[in-house]
Amino acid sequence: MWSVRLYPLALTLLFQCVSPAAARPSGCVDDVEVVQEIGSKEIQAPVVRFEISLTTQSIDAAGIGFREAIFINDAFIGPTLYAKQGDRIEFVVHNYMQQDTSIHFHGIDQRSTPWSDGVPGLTQSQIRPGASFLYNWTAHDAGTYFYHSHAKSQMMDGLYGAVVIAPDDEAPRPFHLISSGEADQAAMLAAEKLMRPIFVSDWSQYTSAEYHGIQHAANIDFSCMDSILVQGVGSQYCLSEEELDDMTNPIVLQLLKELAGGHMTPKGCIPPLQMFNGDFELHLENVPELAYNKCKGGQSSKGNYTIDVDTSIGWAALTFVNPGGLYPLQLSIDSHELYVYAVDGQYVYPIVADRVLVNTGSRISVMIKLDQEKARHVVRVANDYLNQILGGFAELAYDGATNAPKHPHPKTNYGGKLISSEMVSFVPEDSSPYPALRPAQSADSTFKLRLKKLGQPYRAYEWTQTGSLGYNISHEHDDPPLLLQNVEDVPATELTLKTQIGDWVDLVLVTAGPFAQAHPMHKHGNKVFLIGSGSGSFPWESVEEAIPHLPEGTFNFQDPPYLDTFNTVEMEGQANDTWTAVRYKAEYAGAWLFHCHVQTHLSGGMGMVVLDGVDAWPEVPLAYQEWNGFEPPALS
């Protein structure tokens, strides 16, 4: 085993988000459009070395009992990697657990280092117990990203931490679109240099292995969590039947009345009914009482997490990151508007909102004007899916205040619903990158995908992204990894797409009903433009063919969202199916995973491989073919 050497991290807390860009939805301040090219210049810079040690320890994160979790450098939630745009990163992982692992850098494009993307069986072999691995990549694009395990569902056990890359000083920023005042702009610039990433996630009393074990034993699509964590701290709240009914979606409540006693379970979940699981033989006798029907209630010994802000600056900058296993989360702060200025590490034309949606895998950066009472203002976080009423809290403390505000003005209730119809919500798919960036007006190739449960004879928790085949989790153990194979010998299949370098590629994802749900999709290797969506099927062979048959404005080629994680469209009206179209340029050759970021969906098969640039396939360095990224020791 390679010896452990801990290097001091001399890193400054610098941060500002920039990257390509594109447009403005309603509610944005107008501005002269600036168009830039995809990609960022490389800057000569020193090496930043960052080391983490992984262990398994017990934690009671929500006051409902201890369970095993993954600790990074003896802490629950890993340390933040700070770097500057253009820095070369040496990220060393030491695995002291009794299980295999890997680390993926979510949103980092790995344009010249695909062997550091961290997907076992695809870009590397597993990091075995007692082994170490050196990831080596360049911080091409500024912004907030995060590192997390890509082995099994270890993210659900806490294996994640933030990556913050500061941009060039001359990078254009959108703060003048938030305020025309020079003092405000200077304050926002100062606030952004002190930006803090805040992790918000769902949490289960079960480890990821136990969670999947319940799915397998009961043959259900298990979706009932115990709490919401903010920066690793949370509580379990047990609401009354009346309170749950009041916050349950009316359609869901009516279905429950017709099918199963009329209410959510004591944990606020839709019970594991046949209707919602599909036509499978369920074994509900194998579902533990604590899984759905028993709410213990509890609070972390640390209480609610406190976000301290310095009012002398005038503004605060926060980036909310969702590494959760299942749920997109709605977030609001009492008495404060949220000025969204970056999404997925990418500046956007600012949008002012009362509530923001943080998808699993997404990062939402907000400016907050510190002009309210010096007090502890409540931060509210809640599940956005209809399947469970689940909320959590943190506190935004002005200058270390200990008092509650005299006249609080909440924006959302416990279930994440807006208090007033006049309030504004933000979703990442509403964003437009700043400065402007446009996709090509047509694509060189189109791939149509179909997201659905596999159905019989498969299990209730098995999914497909292609319509008929699932990406088996056993691929994590493929040896040699696909990237190290001769790409000419790898056939193009339903689960393996091939593109040519420089091509513009359309991916059209049809989400099958009934009850078509939104899936947070993440493509490794690059961001994508979300160019259109709609209800119903997509019978056309390409976007170009579809344009004459759909209403004007269905597609946006001028200023579409530019994201590394996007939601497919959920059920609309009476249509069973929905469709979502994204476009990207195959600029960076490599073997990239494209998958749903809901961990039970990915482990259940909702993934596939995209081999971009097969005509310019990279040569993998010998260190990554043989020695986990390290150079072999010199022989004397």
Swiss-Prot record:
Cu cation 3 binds at residues 150, 524, 595. Keywords: Copper, Glycoprotein, Metal-binding, Oxidoreductase, Repeat, Signal. Pathway: Mycotoxin biosynthesis. It comes from the Eukaryota. Gene3D superfamilies: Cupredoxins - blue copper proteins (2.60.40.420). Residues 62-168, 318-381, 486-613 form the Plastocyanin-like domain. It holds the Pfam family Cu-oxidase_3. Cu cation 4 binds at residues 519, 596, 601. Multicopper oxidase; part of the gene cluster that mediates the biosynthesis of cercosporin, a light-activated, non-host-selective toxin. The perylenequinone chromophore of cercosporin absorbs light energy to attain an electronically-activated triplet state and produces active oxygen species such as the hydroxyl radical, superoxide, hydrogen peroxide or singlet oxygen upon reaction with oxygen molecules. These reactive oxygen species cause damage to various cellular components including lipids, proteins and nucleic acids. Belongs to the multicopper oxidase family. PANTHER family: LACCASE-RELATED, MULTI-COPPER OXIDASE. This is Multicopper oxidase CTB12.
